[in-house]
Amino acid sequence: MAKDLEALARRKAKVRRAIRVAANGRPRLSVHRTSQHIYAQVIDDANGETLAAASSLEKDLRTSLKTGADTDAAKTIGKLVAERALAKGVTAVVFDRGAYIFHGRVKALAEGAREGGLQF
């Protein structure tokens, strides 16, 4: 168990280092997923503030989504966070998948954000 957690931490740190190099002043779209929900934030690391956020826990989404743990919910969250980021004037971001592989819900969120108008 400890080796798994260490590998997860190493993978997350590796992704963050690559993002810092590639960012060029762009904010990052950070993804967090649990077994029941998915969360996304657009974070400006230079100023240390969150510019936009969306999650499957929001009341208006909980009634419209079947569950917060499927690819349809992730795609909806991606579109919503893109809409909120565009309202704040953010058009280009760096995608931060954290320690998660780019597959399933994480990929669906990225596709939703691209459809919503974000470029990365």
Swiss-Prot record:
Q: What keywords sit in the KW lines? A: Ribonucleoprotein, Ribosomal protein, RNA-binding, rRNA-binding
Q: Does the keyword Cell membrane apply?
A: no
Superkingdom per UniProt: Bacteria
Which ranges does the record mark as transmembrane? none
Its biological purpose: This is one of the proteins that bind and probably mediate the attachment of the 5S RNA into the large ribosomal subunit, where it forms part of the central protuberance.
Keyword RNA-binding among record annotations:
yes
Q: What is this protein called?
A: Large ribosomal subunit protein uL18
**How is this protein annotated for GO cellular component?**
cytoplasm; ribonucleoprotein complex; ribosome
**GO molecular function annotation:** 5S rRNA binding; structural constituent of ribosome
* Subunit structure comment from the entry: Part of the 50S ribosomal subunit; part of the 5S rRNA/L5/L18/L25 subcomplex. Contacts the 5S and 23S rRNAs.
Which InterPro entries does the record cross-reference, listed alphabetically? Ribosomal_uL18_bac-type (IPR004389), Ribosomal_uL18_bac/euk (IPR005484)
